[in-house]
């Protein structure tokens, strides 16, 4: 089965009305536009998204829906660093340092809380900076992602020069 577009999200439906099969993905697999996976029920699926979400697949995204059958995304828990900032200045410092490492950064559950995938050098840096943190198991859902850059990706838009010499993004 080849999936070329998303159909919706489970949060917009009552999952009890459907037979839901899940594709379990690691957080870093949610940004793939082309991939092969096996569902929990053993179905082989190929993803070739034409208009992939800029942030990636999110928890509950529906890849396939036909009558009462649904195949949806489940993002697996992974080891993450939960970061708790004490001030706006510390938020700026955290965002700068994490961004400087080109690491993924996600919103946390509360104000001034962030999450990033666990890496020992990042943990050591946060300790050195005196930033409050703890290592926990958590989902890194693309809809909570702060950073949108994708290495080695092609833009999803066309840039052209208009007759009045203005740059037009379509």
UniProtKB/Swiss-Prot annotation:
Coiled-coil regions, chain positions: none
UniProt GO BP: protein folding; protein-containing complex assembly; urea metabolic process
Pfam hit, one: UreE_N
GO cellular component, one term: cytoplasm
Taxonomy, superkingdom: Bacteria
Disulfide partners: none
Aminoacyl-tRNA synthetase is among the record's keywords: no
Claim: Transmembrane is one of the keywords in the record: no
Subcellular location: Cytoplasm
GO molecular function annotations of the record: nickel cation binding; unfolded protein binding
Functional note: Involved in urease metallocenter assembly. Binds nickel. Probably functions as a nickel donor during metallocenter assembly.
Family: Belongs to the UreE family.
Protein name: Urease accessory protein UreE
UniProt organism field: Helicobacter pylori (strain J99 / ATCC 700824)
């Amino acid at each position: 089965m080849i999936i070329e577009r998303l159909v919706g999200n489970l949060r917009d439906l009552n999952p009890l009305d459907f037979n839901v099969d899940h594709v379990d993905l690691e957080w870093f697999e949610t940004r793939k536009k082309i991939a092969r996976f096996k569902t929990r029920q053993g179905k082989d699926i190929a993803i070739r998204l034409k208009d992939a979400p800029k942030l990636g697949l999110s928890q509950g995204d529906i890849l396939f829906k036909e009558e009462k059958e649904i195949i949806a995304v489940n993002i697996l828990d992974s080891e993450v660093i939960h970061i708790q900032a004490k001030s706006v200045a510390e938020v700026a410092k955290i965002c700068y340092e994490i961004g400087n490492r080109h690491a993924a950064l996600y919103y946390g559950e509360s104000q001034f809380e962030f999450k990033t995938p666990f890496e020992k050098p990042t943990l050591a840096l946060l300790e050195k900076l005196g930033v409050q943190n703890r290592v926990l198991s958590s989902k890194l859902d693309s809809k909570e992602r702060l950073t949108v850059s994708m290495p080695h990706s092609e833009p999803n838009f066309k840039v052209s020069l208009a007759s009045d010499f203005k740059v037009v993004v379509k």
